[in-house]
């Protein structure tokens, strides 16, 4: 297991410096190959009442990129260190896709720190086929690109049938010192993340939690099938399922207003102890 100093993690906190009574901070965890700015449409509508933390998780964005150590537990331990550094006693966990697996592991390992869990298009079933998909995807992109125009043209031409994914990947390019564009994440770490996070079933871990949980599913998502979502919603008390029509896997980006509304309502109910 590799150790990342929480002080070296790139993060931003939006909202009040003094925590209002009977509220908890919100932690937004991006998905695989994502970064903190992915939540740019969400935190502005949440931070008026409570602090909202966004961060680049290990191997992503501006945070440290160890050669190995990309299990859900590695990510969760990083977050625990950061939460303790900030002096927070409890927080709401919100995770998209891979970030959902991290949030789930955090709640499982440190239940005393978790006020609630929200999984955005993030299921508990094993998906070992995603390992090969990620390997082939990363191998297919001819990084580094000479300039941003070349990169944009390549993603436009090769993701005509999936412009949302193409745009997401294009946003994950950064300019290197030599002027060329390359991934802002550690590619081998992304493969290890999928190998350790999606190749195994996490249903028992999810069912063992005892905190209020919101499942947000994109109505057209293939990543989080309706049958799997219903199975998770029915496995224990305190699990609530919201399906947002017209959204795919990136619910918070495709239907930001609807996603934020569902999340904010859930957080209010948790803090008012009405669920």
Q: Model-predicted segments: where are they?
A:
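Conserved serine/cysteine hydrolase catalytic core
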Residues: 178-234, 240-243
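Conserved acidic catalytic loop of the alpha/beta-hydrolase fold
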Residues: 76-91
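Residue in the alpha/beta-hydrolase core beta-strand immediately N-terminal to the catalytic nucleophile
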Residues: 56, 92, 115-118
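Gly/Ala-rich beta-loop-alpha elbow adjacent to hydrolase catalytic centers
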Residues: 95, 99, 103
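Conserved HGGG/HGGXW glycine-rich cap/lid loop of the alpha/beta-hydrolase fold
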Residues: 12-62
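Conserved alpha/beta-hydrolase catalytic His-Asp/Glu region
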Residues: 129-132, 144-200, 205
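Flexible "cap/lid" loop of the alpha/beta hydrolase fold
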Residues: 105-109, 115-148
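Catalytic histidine-centered segment of alpha/beta-hydrolase-like enzymes
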Residues: 247-256, 260
């Amino acid at each position: 297991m590799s150790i990342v100093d929480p002080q070296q993690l790139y993060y931003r906190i939006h909202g009040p410096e003094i925590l209002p009574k009977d509220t908890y901070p919100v932690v937004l965890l991006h998905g695989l190959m994502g970064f903190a700015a992915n939540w740019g449409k969400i935190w502005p509508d949440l931070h008026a009442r409570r602090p909202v933390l966004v961060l680049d998780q290990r191997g992503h964005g501006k945070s440290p990129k160890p050669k190995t150590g990309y299990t859900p537990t590695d990510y969760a331990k990083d977050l625990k260190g950061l939460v303790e550094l900030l002096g927070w006693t409890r927080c709401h966990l919100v995770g998209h896709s891979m970030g959902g697996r991290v949030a789930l592991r955090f709640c499982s390992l440190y239940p005393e720190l978790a006020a609630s869990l929200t999984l955005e298009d993030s299921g508990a079933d094993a998906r070992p086929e995603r390992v090969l998909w990620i390997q082939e995807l990363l191998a297919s992109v001819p990084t580094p690109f000479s300039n941003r125009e070349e990169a944009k043209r390549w993603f436009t031409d090769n993701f005509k049938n999936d412009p949302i994914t193409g745009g997401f990947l294009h946003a994950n390019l950064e300019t290197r010192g030599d002027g060329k564009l390359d991934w802002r994440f550690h590619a081998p770490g992304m493969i290890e993340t999928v190998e350790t996070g999606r190749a195994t079933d996490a249903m028992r871990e999810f069912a063992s939690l005892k905190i209020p949980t919101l499942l947000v599913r994109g109505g057209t998502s293939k990543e989080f099938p309706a049958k799997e979502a219903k199975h998770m919603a029915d496995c224990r008390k305190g699990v609530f399922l919201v399906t947002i029509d017209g959204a795919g896997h990136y619910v918070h980006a495709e239907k930001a207003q609807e996603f934020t509304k569902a999340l904010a309502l859930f957080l209010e109910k948790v803090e008012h102890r009405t669920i």
